[in-house]
Swiss-Prot record:
GO terms for biological process: adenylate cyclase-activating G protein-coupled receptor signaling pathway; epinephrine secretion; mRNA stabilization; prolactin secretion; regulation of protein localization. Keywords: Amidation, Hormone, Secreted. PROSITE patterns: GLUCAGON. The lineage of its organism: Eukaryota, Metazoa, Chordata, Craniata, Vertebrata. It is found in: Secreted. The modification Threonine amide is found at residue 28. It comes from Amia calva. This is Vasoactive intestinal peptide. The gene is vip.
Length: 28
């Protein structure tokens, strides 16, 4: 169970980082 929670949080974190990177590339 803890692995599933960790993976879920990790994928969500990765998505947030990808979105930030995308926004940065669009805004600059």
């Amino acid at each position: 169970h803890s692995d599933a929670i960790f993976t879920d949080n990790y994928s969500r974190f990765r998505k947030q980082m990808a979105v930030k990177k995308y926004l940065n590339s669009v805004l600059t």
